[in-house]
């Protein structure tokens, strides 16, 4: 069974026990669920259930896909994400979950992942005698903002996607000769746990134990307040791992972070009336890898053919094309699309009438939008008519029922008959 949650609140309410009983591992779920306002292409929550097994997933753009649960359900989750054209930037979870999910997702999508980090999740409920760091002051904020950016660049090799608010009361610093040489801060504080993050030492003062002093001070305060302290450490940095373990932190679980690699395998979604007919125009193009029939443009997940045809769901019949951009360009695909529709008809296509048969191109890519506008202008100037094809943001794609997939290939005679009775074969195709 698959559950597609309407928003983050519904997701958390349904999985509160799972998340709260494993809160240290799932603190990012707790942090991000309030920002999920719907089931959207880049922001979504899903749960896979198989008897007593479960796998929960949360994706909040621009962050990573979060996973927790049974590794055996990764293949099912990967298919759901792929088949709905959902967007992920990367994955963060336990090593076994990340490895299995990426293997499954690559099988379906042909996309690739790049390993970023192997991290140890360490916890501590001990107190030490080291309390040499101090809380930051308002005067320290400017330098802490600079350190926060340097920390992010050093760890992730890029500037932060979102500027973090520096709250002095959460930051601790160690000063040497009245200069901040090391800092860290508390974050993701819950009733029973609190994380230590952003541990950064000025490169000129490293190897002198200053980070240890800062982390020990913060950890002591957290533990004295009745909470468990936790932090992440790069498994490829044995010095940091040894430092934290030497002051009482213990390994809870190893976690892994990967990012999606930009590749030559792309996807595009077109609505061009009857998906049987429009799909047939792309099957034999060199560089086209897959053509799927489905529904896009509406809110309901997995609508049926009859629901879409009724015009009540807001969906249009559409196709999702997966292609090799080294062999065929987006512009060539778009030209093929326009050559196989009536771009001047805004109420359907040929014999098929109604909102579910309207035409649309789905994209968020600015370059693709420019290509679309250029083609539209060329057509309108040449034919002196208004093009009625909509340009819409990328949306969730829902695979149509199996009998609608590869219809032209499975049933060539029926496909030819459908083209004839629909009026497509008699239509004078435009030239671009």
Where are these regions (language model features)?
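Conserved active-site alpha-helix within GNAT-family acetyltransferase domains
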Residues: 97-111, 212, 236-253
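Flexible coil/turn and secondary-structure edge motifs
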Residues: 263-432
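Acyl-donor-binding surface of acyltransferase catalytic domains
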Residues: 60-130
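Short amphipathic alpha-helix that is part of the acyltransferase structural core
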Residues: 1-28, 123-157, 404
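A conserved beta-strand-loop-helix scaffold within acyl/acetyltransferase catalytic domains
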Residues: 60-61, 161-200
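Conserved acetyl-CoA-binding loop-helix of GNAT-fold acetyltransferases
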Residues: 72-79, 201, 207-221, 242, ...
